[in-house]
Curated annotation (Swiss-Prot):
The gene is S100Z. Ca(2+) 2 binds at D63, N65, D67, E69, E74. Keywords: Calcium, Metal-binding, Repeat. This is Protein S100-Z. Residues 13-48, 50-85 form the EF-hand domain. Signal peptide: none annotated. InterPro entries: EF-hand-dom_pair, EF_Hand_1_Ca_BS, EF_hand_dom, S100/CaBP7/8-like_CS, S100_Ca-bd_sub.
Length: 99
């Protein structure tokens, strides 16, 4: 039986491939595919954001090779960065509560 971390990794891989390759290259997310992924899979995160051009900024920041698409490595960097930010927020909330 897979561990929770193994299931989380499997979920990330499956989500990436569910959205990638519909518009262009099979193993990359176009800007439109990434936008759809973010809207459907990170609903809470996006609802708290005030920046209207957030998806464009995310693509620009993630697109290390400047091909205007996001590959799996670039996608994982985004998920990791968001996870770190969420953890930082969680730790700050615990500190405020004195735990």
């Amino acid at each position: 039986m897979p561990t929770q971390l193994e299931m989380a990794m499997d979920t990330m891989i499956r989500i990436f491939h569910r959205y990638s390759g519909k518009e262009r290259k099979r193993f990359k997310l176009s800007k439109g595919e990434l936008k759809l992924l973010l809207q459907r899979e990170l609903t809470e995160f996006l609802s708290c954001q005030k920046e209207t051009q957030l998806v464009d900024k995310i693509v620009q920041d993630l697109d290390a090779n400047k091909d205007n698409e996001v590959d799996f490595n670039e996608f994982v960097v985004m998920v990791a960065a968001l996870t770190v930010a969420c953890n930082d927020y969680f730790v700050e909330q615990l500190k405020k509560k004195g735990k």
